[in-house]
Each structure stands twice: as structure tokens, then as C-alpha cells.
Amino acid sequence: MESYDIIANQPVVIDNGSGVIKAGFAGDQIPKYCFPNYVGRPKHMRVMAGALEGDLFIGPKAEEHRGLLAIRYPMEHGVVRDWNDMERIWQYVYSKDQLQTFSEEHPVLLTEAPLNPSKNREKAAEVFFETFNVPALFISMQAVLSLYATGRTTGVVLDSGDGVTHAVPVYEGFAMPHSIMRVDIAGRDVSRYLRLLLRKEGADFHTSAEFEVVRTIKERACYLSINPQKDEALETEKVQYTLPDGSTLNVGPARFRAPELLFQPDLIGDESEGLHEVLVFAIHKSDMDLRRTLFANIMLSGGSTLFKGFGDRLLSEVKKLAPKDVKIKISAPQERLYSTWIGGSILASLDTFKKMWVSKKEYEEDGSRAIHRKTF
């Protein structure tokens, strides 16, 4: 097959989140596959023949057998810490269980958090070009893709996932690098804090598989309080949560105390800005003429914005920091868990996308410099 024909193939879009990886083909409306971005290794000795085969589990199989496995996330706060495991997960994306395709036959759009170390991007390019032999690669910023998904060209995206929270102002399709704000406080920190709070309430979760149970409790039971001081004073109604072993757990004030961390990182001694400050500071770092428009076009993206009460709380906090007469409008698209991937799918389907990517030939000639030249 001629290299041009291969480049004309449908691109593969991989939204490489710290917590969940979403993958599929450009042009599709939603990602074909979504699974936790972790690998599991058996932590006990195999004593029976015909027992679960394999030394490494990824995707649905790792979820299904997680009680037997030591779970490890190769990404922490948007940066890959273990490249071997990350490579295995990407290999699995192409396997017969997932996309069922050969990596060398499709260009790739890969997403990345803004203000990531450039070494992270260089290594990702090296893996895709040298290990997976992809014909072309484009590494795109997550928040900009979320805006593509809504069909807008102007707005400020507040994207909070599992590893990173960032705010990126975009005006008429131009992202403003100097205005980007990022903090490494996100969903996984909320899960860790919830585990600590549940321990104080009498429930102990200590293994890596039990941490996944805590994550599920967070997703199903936690909410953001509009007035945490008031809720602290009231006797919070406890919610019963059924654990995988059938026993029940009563979750009390931890339900709103844990996600409060997103707005008050100092609860765990972190000196980062709260999520509302990240958003407002990003707008204030933009040109004065653009601020009013940006305040009226705030868009939420990522799994950590799905907490019940998140939008109302964010609006009340932003109002305190914004100029008095400014109109504030926050949009929370229903598909915001996937909006980065959907934006990637739209971008990779456009004809102009072919001008944006780095081909294997360019990479062989210029190395990692080619990647930086074509990504912002």
C-alpha cells in the first residue's frame, strides 16, 4: 500500500486521560471504547491449572478481576510515569479486543493536557512512530478539542478530569498560551481524600482494587455543596452504599467534604488555586477586550465536572471573583465526559487536518523538533 493511501485512511483518535482512555475512529460520534487507564498484575500465586491466564490485564478484564490484581495507573497528573505500561495499554487499544486494526495503517490524533513537560510529548511521538510505526501523528491540547465538540470557536474551557484541571481561553479559534492555567488537583485527588474521610467514618479501603471501589462511591454518592459551612452545621443525611461484597456502608459528610477539595485544595495542604480561581485567573490573563465575551462563554469538560451541584457552586464562586456587571454563562454539555474525544473525532475528519499532522517522513528527518513545530 502506498504511504499516501495509508495517510488517507480514517485516523484513530485516542484521548489519553489519566483515569480513563477513550479510543475510536475519526468521524464516529462517540468513542468506540472507554476503559480505565490502568494495568493489573496478579498479586497471588497461581495454584490451579486452567486458572486465569496471563501476567498482565488491561481494560474490561482488569476491571472484572481487580480483586486479584495489583492495579497501577501509568499516568499521574496528566504525565506518563511508566512508559512500558503505557505502551502496553496503547497496544491493547489496537488489539483484537478493541479497534482490531494495525497501527501502521492509520494516522493518530493523541490528546495531551496543556503545559505538560515537552519530554512527555517527545516520548509519546517516539513510541507511536518507532514502536507502532504510525504513518502520521498529531498531538492536540484537550481543552481546545472540547470546544470543537460544541461547534464554538470562542470560549473558555474548564476541563477537570482525573489527573489535571485546566482552563484554556480560546478566541475565534486561537488559543492563548499565555492565559492558560493548570493545576494538578482533580478527580484522583478527590478519591484519595474520600478514602481518608471514609477511614475516619470507620470504613477502611487500603488495596489498589479497593481504591477503585472508593472511586465508584465518589461517582455515585458525592455532590458539591452550594454552602459547605451550612451543611457542616446541619446533620447530613447519610446515604447507604452497597459494597461489592454485599455489605452496606453509610456515607455521611464525606459526600460533600471530598469534592470540596476541588475548590479548596488547602484541605490537603496543597497550595494550588481552587478550580474557580483557575478559571477566573485564566480569563483575567487574557486581553481586556476579550474578557466580557469569555465570561459569557464558559464551557465545562471532563469527568470531575459531573458532580451533582458542580455548575451552581462554580457559578456562585465565579460571581464573587468577577467584575460586578459582567454576565456569566456556564454551559455543561451532557456528553462532557467524552467532549475531548468528540472534538478530536471532528478535527481529524476535516480535510485541513492533513496539513496539521507530522508524517513519519518529517519525524525521521527532524526528530522530536517536528512534533513541537506542529503542536501548540
UniProtKB/Swiss-Prot annotation:
User: Where does the chain cross the membrane?
Assistant: none
Record's InterPro entries? Answer: Actin, Actin/actin-like_CS, Actin_CS, ATPase_NBD
List, in alphabetical order, the Gene Ontology terms for molecular function in this entry.
ATP binding
Q: Where in the cell is it found?
A: Cytoplasm, Cytoskeleton; Cytoplasm, Cytoskeleton, Microtubule organizing center, Centrosome
One cellular component (GO) term of this entry: centrosome
Provide the positions where the record notes the PTM 3'-nitrotyrosine: 4
Query: To which protein family does this belong?
Result: Belongs to the actin family. ARP1 subfamily.
User: What name is this protein filed under?
Assistant: Beta-centractin
